[in-house]
Amino acid sequence: MPLQDFLKVLDSITTHTNPHDVFVIISGGEPTVREDLETCGKEISRRGYPWGMVCNGLCLTRERLHNLIRSGMRSISISLDGLKDVHNWMRRHPESFDCAVNAIWEITAIPELTFDVITCVTRRSLPQLPAMKELLISLGVKRWRVSTIFPVGRAAE
């Protein structure tokens, strides 16, 4: 969605919504591919809304993370759908798991940022949940959301 359209949508809800009653979440596709994500965040904050995002960690560097926090981001969720083999298969990217784990590692170093990890359980990832739990604990994760996924596409395998 182009920035101007995003701002129009934001303004349309601002006219009848108390910003203190709403928390804006930016999510999928992948928010961090937006070159104007920090601008979006600043505009959300300027209108009085707290905001956060759900991302896969692929494009989330330390510098980008700090820029997003300076833009007003208060929370972030990182998707991690299995251990390396399953997560990379599910995300169709050979570095997806490593990027997600690195993002989680960076995020745990920022105590003022609320964060969690989201796992969509599939047949392939179900046996990995105990090992994932241990991994997440070792990374300092305190909140882990585990959910099922509608079994279509790769999720059905």
Please name every model-derived segment.
Residues 155-157:
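Nucleotide-sugar-dependent glycosyltransferase catalytic core
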Residues 3-26, 34-151:
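Radical SAM/AdoMet-radical enzyme domain recognition
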